[in-house]
Regions:
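Catalytic core of pol beta-like nucleotidyltransferases
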Residues: 1-25, 31-37, 47-104
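Short beta-strand->loop micro-motif that forms the acidic, two-metal-ion catalytic signature
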Residues: 42-46
């Protein structure tokens, strides 16, 4: 599947499954443009709440299912907006913030 089609599928799934106020970003090699055939798709999902609850951890599952359906590896990471901002001192946070592409 073409890159733009994968991005469109991810975006459409986000529109139909994520709670209002959520943000969805693509990061990593797919966002930087240096991905190769077989590279995974790294997603950051931020929920508009201070802390995640047990239910929130399942929010990424539909994205994994999409990946299985289209034969791509999709790896969603889910955080609350507050929890994500608390990681601002980490190299992971800095790399994601540098590379990310807004999908929603």
């Amino acid at each position: 599947m073409e890159r733009i089609q994968v991005i469109d599928n991810i975006r459409q799934l986000g529109l139909t499954t994520l709670p209002v106020g959520s943000s969805l970003f693509l990061y990593g090699s797919q966002a930087r443009g240096d991905a190769h055939k077989g590279s995974d798709w790294d997603l950051l999902i931020l929920l508009d709440k201070p802390v995640l609850t047990g239910q929130d951890y399942g929010i990424g599952y539909p994205f994994r299912c999409l990946g299985w359906d289209i034969d791509e590896e999709i790896n969603p990471q889910v955080y609350s907006q507050k929890e994500w901002s608390d990681y601002s001192y980490t190299p992971f946070y800095k790399n994601v913030e540098q590379d990310k592409i807004v999908l929603l």
